[in-house]
Amino acid sequence: MQSIRNIAIIAHVDHGKTTLVDKIIHASKIFRENQQFEDLILDNNDLERERGITILSKNVSVRYKDTKINIIDTPGHADFGGEVERVLKMADGVILLVDAFEGPMPQTRFVLGKALELGLTPIVVINKVDKENCRPDEVHEAVFELMFNLDATEEQLEFHTLYGSAKNNWMGEDWKNPNDSILPLLDAVVKYIPEPKIDEGSTQMQITSLDFSNFVGRIAIGRVKRGSIKEGQQYALCKEDGVVKRVKVKELHVFEGLGKNKVTEVQAGDICAITGVEGFDIGDTIADLENPEPLDRISIDEPTMNMLFTINNSPFFGKEGKFVTSRHLRERLMKETEK
């Protein structure tokens, strides 16, 4: 059985989260030496690249020594509260990334509070210590106070701290002595973040996010909590209203590097993507057909944003845009509701 660590990264907008993940990916040698890549690999949605923010959570996976590390990128905004909560359900620990000058910000508090509530183990990374006027020691105190105010347990308050600069590709335990490697962070993840806790019993997996492909339709993503999921087998899909549907797993993928690898079976503790399951919603449980036991649903905060769609009355009306007819707009909006 391979050793797995599932970690989520929490950070305020612009504190360097996506850059840090980029450096981890490069350190684990996913790219060939001569391969071209864009910076901000994780922000692959157009809006995210334009604004430099993370809205949807993405999963990447790196292998370090003999451990598979699944990295789950979380949105840093309270506006995406539902997304945050679902994503943290897949993790066993979190990396809290904080700017060495700005310190913990209000939005960090929201996501960190959710993580501590779920009992996740934190590692604190104080980033950008190369900036002028940075104050790493004060920021460390501020993080401790924040966790204390959020009712962290004694174990959570004994968090491991690393200092560094993701941009300059280093992390270490002493910010006054920079080194030249980001690997101490991966060592800390393997050492301090617990392995997934695996319960005995029949298959259970909660769908915590989804992906969409024009070829195979909706893809269910989640972490296998108990048992295993096998390709080609039939399972029970437990819906919110108590209805249990029979579904068949057509294809099974695990995250490997920036992509996905097709596999025939996924064991408890790993995160996987399933195609072929029709009519699922986020929060549904894929369970054993003979003995379907649904997992508790995730309570999601109500959305904090209202939108109004009106007729375009700008001077460029009808002259630009990819989706211009009402049919196109309807299809595009409906596709968004499937996510």
PLM region descriptions:
Residues I30-S57, F80, L146-E158, V190-T203, ...:
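Active-site phosphate-binding and catalytic loops of NTP-dependent enzymes
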Residues L88, V94-Q156:
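Conserved C-terminal guanine-recognition region of P-loop GTPase G domains, centered on the G4
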Residues F148-I282:
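Conserved catalytic-core segments of large NTP-driven translation/proteostasis enzymes
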Residues N261-V263, A268-K339:
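C-terminal effector modules of nucleic-acid-centric enzymes and ribosome-associated factors
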